[in-house]
From Swiss-Prot:
This is Small, acid-soluble spore protein H. It is found in: Spore core. Its main location: other. It holds the Pfam family SspH. Signal peptide: none annotated. GO terms for biological process: asexual sporulation; sporulation resulting in formation of a cellular spore. It comes from Alkaliphilus metalliredigens (strain QYMF). The gene is sspH. GO terms for cellular component: endospore-forming forespore.
């Protein structure tokens, strides 16, 4: 996923399905300098991680 689309998903009022390693996630924010996103699994909001944008898949 590119950074522009990730930002659009964050700003969207709708819930857009995105996965990381096959698991549904929520994108919290995007770091444009490192091309990464801070995410958490939908079912584990307390488990945050920073992952490469390239590994995020929109469905």
């Amino acid at each position: 996923m590119d950074k522009t689309r990730a930002q659009e998903i964050i700003s969207s009022p709708n819930m857009i399905s995105v996965t990381y390693n096959g698991k549904e996630i929520y994108i919290e924010n995007v770091n444009e300098n490192t091309q990464t996103a801070n995410i958490h699994l939908l079912n584990k909001p307390d488990k945050k991680q920073e992952v490469p944008l390239n590994n995020l898949v929109e469905h």
